[in-house]
């Protein structure tokens, strides 16, 4: 699926396809126990590292501020969380590694996933709410005999398509 054509592209990203689909594949017997356990371990490490960067403070330092300005972003005057720096568009998980002394040695894919989750943290809950609202709309049935051409404000082309497809609920 091309995520650019999906309504929920923040949730249906290619980087998290294993997290979304492997549990189903395992349940259906299409995935070995070894691969499934490997995926679970990967996301356990991601969650653990995300928790760490959300808690870890960095103190202001001349070297850090020079580095930040060199990367086109403002320096810090008070301490900040590692996650706050990762959220900046000019920076990322790997870029700030020299200033994160408690960082464990992890596979690059773990760091990439941590960065993506940190950067999308504000947007994903909103999209999950949107998905839940759409699910509720799917429970609202449409009258079978509704003539969409009688609805004022609806373009003729849209009304004709709706009359042709006859959606059964508001979610469709």
What is the role of each PLM region?
Residues 1:
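Conformationally flexible catalytic loops at phosphate/diphosphate-handling active centers
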Residues 5, 11, 22-171:
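Extended, charge-enriched "interface" segments that sit outside catalytic cores
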Residues 12-18:
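Active-site helical microenvironments for divalent-metal-assisted chemistry
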């Amino acid at each position: 699926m091309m995520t650019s054509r999906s309504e929920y592209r923040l949730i249906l990203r290619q980087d998290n396809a294993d997290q979304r689909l492997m549990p189903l594949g395992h349940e259906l017997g299409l995935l070995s126990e070894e691969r499934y356990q490997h995926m679970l371990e990967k996301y356990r490490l991601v969650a653990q590292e995300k928790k760490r960067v959300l808690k870890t403070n960095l103190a202001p330092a001349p070297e850090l501020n020079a580095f930040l300005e060199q990367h086109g972003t403002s320096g810090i005057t008070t301490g900040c969380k590692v996650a706050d720096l990762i959220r900046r568009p000019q920076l990322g998980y790997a870029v700030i590694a020299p200033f994160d002394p408690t960082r464990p040695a992890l596979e690059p894919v773990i760091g990439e996933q941590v960065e993506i989750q940190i950067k999308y943290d504000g947007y994903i809950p909103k999209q999950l709410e949107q998905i839940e609202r759409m699910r509720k709309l799917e429970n609202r049935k449409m009258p079978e005999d509704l003539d969409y051409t009688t609805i004022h404000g609806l373009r003729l082309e849209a009304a004709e398509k709706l009359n042709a497809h006859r959606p059964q609920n508001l979610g469709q």
